[in-house]
Amino acid sequence: LRGADGQIAATDGQQALVQTGFTLPWTDDVLVPATGAFVAKVIRAAVQVSLGRSTDWIFIRADEWTVALQIEKDRRFPAIEAHVPEVSSASTTMVLAETDATFLDQAAQRLPGASEMNSPVTLDLNGAVVIRAKSGEQSSVTDLVLRNSRRQGDELKVSSNREYVRRAIQLGFRELHFRDAEAPAFCRDD
């Protein structure tokens, strides 16, 4: 929780989420542990949300519920800024049409290989936008051709965990940016 610029950043070590535009009642950076409390329906549906802080704790009040998180003073948050660069640094962008985004979010779970380690898919961004998947027992590849979507920039073929692609879609992103096939994909909504 970055008080100086009103930024909330979170990571699980594989994915990062940075949201800005918050007014926090402190000016320094505060690291708190991850918690599953925010997936609770009563917390997500809260109308009134407020924050408070003591020397050792952050308090988040969501309607009648309060979550207390102990400040982790001896730990540091990873420098994730390098992994969420400016859009201009992308060599390729996958632009998803709304209909294709909805379709991909639902279909990705049914593609082969969903239960394999890292739930892999290949994003083949050439003349078309194609999502490819194959299970270990399968000899042929299954293709999802997203006819209403397009690629901007260079042609690219990149492997990804399908759940990361789905998470981006569920967060409302319709542009996935790539610097190259080895760098992490990123989305921005500035």
Predicted features and spans:
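DNA polymerase processivity clamps
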Residues: 1-77, 84-190
